[in-house]
A protein has these predicted regions:
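Sec/Tat signal peptide C-region and signal peptidase I cleavage site
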Residues: 22-26
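Lectin-like carbohydrate-binding module/patch detector with strong preference for beta-trefoil
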Residues: 27-161
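Bacterial N-terminal signal peptides that target proteins for export
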Residues: 1-13
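Bacterial N-terminal signal peptides
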Residues: 11-21
Length: 161
């Protein structure tokens, strides 16, 4: 089942992202999901399921393994996999998105911008979650990049697991 993300009012302390899943966000429950780009067929994954600090993320065929199942925590606005957070790492366009220990770092905070049936994930640094060179091939790295209104490599579909 696809999940769309909506931005809630800026004053909402309980949940800045709302999942269209019965009560998931309102209850503050973490939600497990796969993340696919516009056009589908691929998912973001941790290469080789190697959940270690500074490990970059990449695109791969969707397969529902633990390496592709992320958890969104609406209270912290963190996207996690294993016990690590997805981190914008550095904050410059082209920096690879990596895993790091969860904390209060701005690079670990992700908000969303609904774009029709898709969602952009925007880091607190103002850069978007992006596929390098727009490639959806296996192994294509995930990076942060300047947000654009017509960037298909920044539009994501969330599949609930």
């Amino acid at each position: 089942m696809s999940i769309a993300l909506l931005r809630t009012a800026a004053g909402s302390a309980a949940c800045l992202l709302t999942f269209l899943v019965a009560g998931a966000c309102a209850q503050g429950y973490p939600t497990m999901l796969q993340i696919s780009p516009q056009g589908g067929g691929r998912c973001i994954e941790v290469p080789d399921g190697d959940f270690v600090q500074d490990r970059g993320l990449q695109m791969a065929e969707c397969n529902s393994t633990a390496a592709q199942i992320f958890v969104y925590d609406p209270a912290a606005m963190h996207l996690t996999i294993g016990d690590l957070c997805v981190d914008a790492n550095g904050g410059k366009p082209g920096d690879l998105v990596k895993l790091s220990p969860c904390g209060a770092g701005a690079g670990q905070t992700w908000t969303s911008e609904p774009k029709g049936n898709f969602t952009k994930l925007v880091g607190q640094n103002g850069l978007c979650l992006d596929i390098r060179y727009g490639s959806k091939e296996n192994g294509a790295p995930v990076q942060s990049w300047n947000c654009g209104d017509s960037e298909p490599n920044q539009l994501w579909i969330f599949q609930r697991e």
